[in-house]
A protein has these predicted regions:
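Hydrophobic h-region of N-terminal signal peptides that target proteins for export
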Residues: 9-16
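Acidic, low-complexity Ser/Thr/Gly/Pro-rich repeat segments typical of extracellular/periplasmic
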Residues: 17-296
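Unusually extended, aromatic-enriched hydrophobic runs near protein termini
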Residues: 129, 209-216, 324-327, 342, ...
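Sec-dependent signal peptide recognition
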Residues: 1-9
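Short, surface-exposed "cap/lid" segments of acyl-processing enzymes
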Residues: 170, 177, 184, 326-353
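N-terminal cap/lid segment of alpha/beta-hydrolase-fold proteins
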Residues: 268-336
Length: 353
């Protein structure tokens, strides 16, 4: 996904149409692309339980898999907020063509504080507050089944975001290059970045929606003030908070380390004798915790794990599996052989190793 700053400025501001601006609608207007009306991800799209609201995600192909995946994401009890490194989408008004497309900038180009596009850690409690992250940027000119036209897309690459941290993605008027002074921010967004009630510029915004938006954008307002960035120079922005998806995995690991090791069901026996290594196999009974039917190809087939009140995973079944070990035909180093673990998961064969 790549498009250059120069290309964007040429496409957005060639003078054949109105100056484009970010679509930022707090009125819940009935729109087939309403999912993108405040950008994504956004803390404006969190439910009361802290999970993302994906109810307006477009299902134009009526794909059962996509629809069920969106519902599962809302229902997943182990996650609030957004996953680190979630792609970012900002919708712009207007229609554009791709006639001037050129080579894009490298993601690291945007990881500086004077870039026209910036992904920023804005969390007051973060040790990395103010850090810029590299992003791979694209601009979609035409709509498809799931995305509207005139959609700016950014994918974080090369550096992971932290869990339980608030981030902002901003686009400044410098995206327009020589036409920077002609680019205007969305008025509702501009008021939020200045700490003003957006109802002053759009009376259709409810008091509740205005207050929520002011609270969501407060960390970005503080960051802009801290760094001396003029809110009038920010033409698009989204703010979101990451969750803690690793918490469940770490908890599982801690619980399982306390369990006794299951014994082998058979003795080790040699299965291969090659010039480079020998291979041995045995069988082992292991517990299974996912409900449903292997290999869980769709959410309807299960794959969830139930937990007891103390957070212990509930065993659903046991099965016997083959365990394979390969040993190099070289003298073992004083510190031992290096170990690589290969776990196939949801099916597969031991000799895939």
């Amino acid at each position: 996904m790549k498009i250059s700053t120069v290309v964007l400025s040429g496409i957005l501001l060639t003078g054949c149409y109105e100056t484009p601006e970010m679509v930022f609608d707090l009125t819940d207007e009935d729109d087939k692309w309403a999912f993108y009306n405040v950008g994504f991800p956004s803390d404006l799209r969190l439910l009361e339980n802290g999970r993302p609201d994906l109810s307006e995600f477009p299902h134009r192909l009526l794909s059962p898999l996509v629809m069920e995946a969106a519902r599962e994401a809302e229902r997943y009890e182990g996650m609030t907020g957004y996953a680190p490194d979630t792609p970012v989408y900002i919708r712009f008004s207007g229609d554009y063509t791709a006639e001037d497309l050129g080579l894009g900038e490298l993601p690291a180009y945007f990881a500086v504080d004077d870039a026209a596009i910036q992904l920023i850690d804005i969390d007051p409690d973060s040790a990395l507050r103010g850090t810029r992250y590299p992003v791979d940027v694209d601009f979609r000119f035409e709509e498809d089944e799931y995305r509207p036209a005139s959609l700016l897309e950014a994918l974080p690459v090369g550096a992971s975001q932290q869990e339980n941290t608030t981030y902002a993605f901003i686009v400044t008027r410098e995206i327009a290059g020589d036409y920077a002074s002609e680019l205007e921010p969305n008025k509702v967004l501009n008021y939020l970045l200045k700490g003003k009630n957006p109802r002053y510029v759009d009376w259709s915004v409810s008091s509740e929606a205005g207050a929520e938006a002011l609270a969501v954008y407060a960390p970005l307002r503080e960051q802009l003030a801290l760094e001396g960035i003029n809110p009038d120079d920010v033409v698009a922005a989204v703010v979101w908070t990451t969750g803690e998806p690793s918490k469940t995995a770490f908890r599982l690991g801690e619980v399982m380390q306390e369990w006794p090791l299951y014994p082998l069901q058979t003795e080790w026996h040699k299965t291969e004798d090659r010039p480079e290594y020998c291979a041995y196999e045995a069988t082992w009974t292991v517990p299974g915790f996912q409900k449903g039917w292997l290999p869980y190809p769709m959410p309807l087939w299960g794959g969830d794990i139930d937990y007891s009140d103390d957070g212990t995973p509930i065993e659903q079944y046991q099965r016997t599996v083959t365990v394979g070990v390969t040993i190099p035909r070289t003298p073992m180093p004083a510190e031992g052989y290096p170990v690589m673990l290969f776990h196939h998961g949801t099916g597969g064969w031991t000799d895939n190793l």
